[in-house]
Amino acid sequence: MAKKAILVITDGIGYSSGMEYNAFYNAQKPTYDKLFSNTPHSFIETHGLSVGLPEGQMGNSEVGHMSMGSGRVLYQDLVKISLSLSENRFRDNEAFRELLAKSSRLHLIGLMSDGGVHSHIDHFMGIADIAAKEGKEVFLHLITDGRDVSPTSAKKYLAQVEKHLGANIKIATVSGRFYSMDRDNRWERVQKGYEAIVKAEPKTTLNPSEYIDASYAKNETDEFIEPIAFDGYDGMSDNDSVLMINFRSDRMREITTAIGESNFSSFEKSDIKLHVATITEYDKNFSYPVLFKKDSPKNTLSEVISSAGLRQLHTAETEKYAHVTFFFNGGIDEPYENETRVLIPSPNVRTYDEKPQMSAKEVGEVVLKGMDEAYDFIVVNFANGDMVGHTGNLEAAKIAVNTVDSELGKILQKAKEMDYSVLITSDHGNCEEMRDDDGNILTNHTAGKVWCFVEAEGVSRVEDGGLNNIAPTILKLMGLEIPKEMDHSLV
C-alpha cells in the first residue's frame, strides 16, 4: 500500500551567506530552527542549466514548478536552440533542411539582441552562417530591441552582425520592435514592418549604421526605429523561404500572420507565395513547419500518482495557483483523475508588504483538512517569501517568513500524527537577499541554492541535487515506482 506524502513549496525562501539584509536569517522561525537541528536536509540548485535556463540565469516559479513536477530538466527554448547550434545539430533539423531545400533564398526575421527574452543574436547569426555555407542567399531582417537591453545598444549588436556579412549574407531591412513585434492588433504599425521586409519600401541609401545614427538624431531609440530597406534589397520573391527566429511567440504572431497567411485582410499585402517556418510554435492555428516543438513531459509526478489510483490535492493562493496546477503538471490544464484543486484568493492589496501574511493561514488550513480527508499526496505553495520579497521591504519579508514558519509547524505536527512524509523545498530564492552590499533594494529572484528538508520515517540523509530530483524523491517516499523519464531520488 502506498504511503502518504506532502510537498511543501516555500516560494522565494533560499540560502544566502549574507546576513544583514537576509529576511530569512533575521526572522523569528522556530519551526525552521528545529528543522535545521533535527531533520535531514540538503541544498538544491534552482537556476541556470539545472532548470534548463542559460548558465547563471536566475530561476523563476514557472520553470521551478515544471522541474519539480516533471522530475527532469526541461530545457527552455533558448537553451535548446543554443545547444543545437553549439553541438552542430541544428543543420540536421528536419524542418530546417526542408525549408532550405525549397529555395535558394532564405529570409531570417527576428530581434537583434542578446536579451534572451524573445530571441538571441547568437541564434540569428548561427543560423545565417549555416544557411550561407549551404550556398543559400541569406537576407537579414533585423528588428532592433531597446526594451530587453539598453535603448541605444543597436549599433553594438549591428557590429556583431557585420562580422558575418559576405557574398551570401546581407542586411536587407531594419525595423524597431514597436512596429514588427506589435501584439495589440495595431496593424498600422505592423504594416510598416511588413512593407519594408516584404516589399522593400521605403528604401534608404544610408548604410545600417548611418541609418541608426539618423534615427537617434530624430530621438528614435532602438524600439522605435522606423522600418527601412537598404540598397541592394528588392523585396521578397515568389518561392522564397522565410524563417522567423524569435523563440517567444507572443510578439511574432502578427508579423508572421501578415507575411504567411494568404487570407490576411488587415491591410493590403503582396500576392506572393512564400515558404514560411517558425523556430518554435507561435500559434496552434498556424500550419507552418516548426523547428523546435514544445515538449509535453510524459509521466509527471501528478500523472504517476493518478495512474496508481491515488488521490491528490493541489493548493495555493491566487498568485501561485497556476504554478501548483498547470506548471507543476507539465503544462496540462485539466486535472488528472482523483486530483482536487483548491484556490485560495490572495488579499486585495496594492503590494504584499501591506499584508505580508497574505493568505497563508487559509492555505495551511486546506492542507490540514486534506490530511483529515486522507489524500495520498498533497502539494502546497506558500507564496509569501517571493511575493513580499519582490516589494523590497525587509521588515515585511521577515513577517512573511515568520508566517510561513508558523504554517509549517502546524503541517509538520499533524503530518507526524497522521503518518505523512513531508518534503519542504523552494522553487527559487528571493527574500534572503533584500538589499545588495551597498544597501540598494533588491526585488529580484536570487541565483543561489535553496534547502530541501525531508521529514520521513527511515530517512537519515538527503543528497544535494536539483528541483528535477523532487518528484522522484516524493515517489520513493510513497513507495511508488520512479518512471524511466525521471531523474534519481535524493533519499
Curated annotation (Swiss-Prot):
Co-factor note (free text): Binds 2 manganese ions per subunit.
Pathway of action: Carbohydrate degradation; glycolysis; pyruvate from D-glyceraldehyde 3-phosphate: step 3/5
A single GO BP: glucose catabolic process
Cofactor(s) this protein cannot do without: Mn(2+)
Keywords: Glycolysis, Isomerase, Manganese, Metal-binding
UniProt-annotated catalytic positions: S61 (phosphoserine intermediate)
EC number: 5.4.2.12
Residues that, per the record, bind Mn(2+) 2: D11, S61, D427, H428
One GO CC term, this protein: cytosol
Enzyme class at the top of the EC tree: isomerase
Catalytic activity: (2R)-2-phosphoglycerate = (2R)-3-phosphoglycerate
Subunit details: Monomer.
Function: Catalyzes the interconversion of 2-phosphoglycerate and 3-phosphoglycerate.
Protein's UniProt name: 2,3-bisphosphoglycerate-independent phosphoglycerate mutase
Organism field: Sulfurimonas denitrificans (strain ATCC 33889 / DSM 1251)
